[in-house]
Design a protein with these regions (language model features):
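Active-site-adjacent alpha-helix immediately C-terminal to a catalytic or transition-state-stabilizing loop
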Residues: 60, 96-128
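Active-site micro-motifs of SAM-dependent methyltransferase domains
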Residues: 12, 85, 114
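Hydrophobic packing residues within well-ordered alpha-helices of enzyme cores
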Residues: 62-66, 91, 117-118
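Short phosphate-binding loop-to-helix
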Residues: 83-100
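Active-site-proximal alpha-helix that buttresses catalytic centers in soluble enzyme cores
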Residues: 2-3, 7-82, 125-127
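Surface-exposed beta-strand edges and their flanking turn/coil or helix-capping segments
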Residues: 19, 92-94, 108
């Protein structure tokens, strides 16, 4: 069975002056959160074999902390600019395009696209 893990970037700081939103970094709270989530994934014993991610600074910084904590070794993310500010439909396209050969695909990006993707993939109730 194929597995999809959806990881939003860690908490970012609005107090840092950057010219573009794309360049906004994570903050200290975000760094702690990225490490904790990585440790959680490691405990689940679900080996990730493919990562696709937005190349935005806050995503790259999140993965720099998350990956060692999750013990993902030298797995290199596939950076896909389409993920930045993507709709759920675009995210589905990215997953189809780059996740075909993965058994456990991790996608890392941004809201509202990731949240909309989850709402599209998960039924409203267990009865559905």
């Amino acid at each position: 069975m194929k597995t999809l893990t959806i990881l939003r970037h860690a908490k970012s700081g609005w107090d840092v002056q950057v010219e573009r939103d794309f360049d906004r970094p994570i903050n200290k709270r975000g760094a702690r959160g990225a490490e904790l989530i990585g440790q959680w994934l490691k405990r689940q014993k679900l080996p990730v074999d493919r990562i696709i991610a937005s190349p935005a600074v806050r995503v790259t910084e999140t993965l720099d902390i998350f990956q060692p904590a999750a013990d993902l070794g030298t797995l290199e993310p596939h950076w896909d600019r389409r993920i930045y500010l993507a709709s759920s439909a675009t995210l589905i396209d990215v997953i189809r395009d780059t996740g075909k050969n993965a058994e456990h695909l991790l996608i890392s990006g941004h809201n509202p696209g990731l949240e909309d993707l989850i709402l599209m993939l998960v039924p409203e109730s267990a009865d559905d």
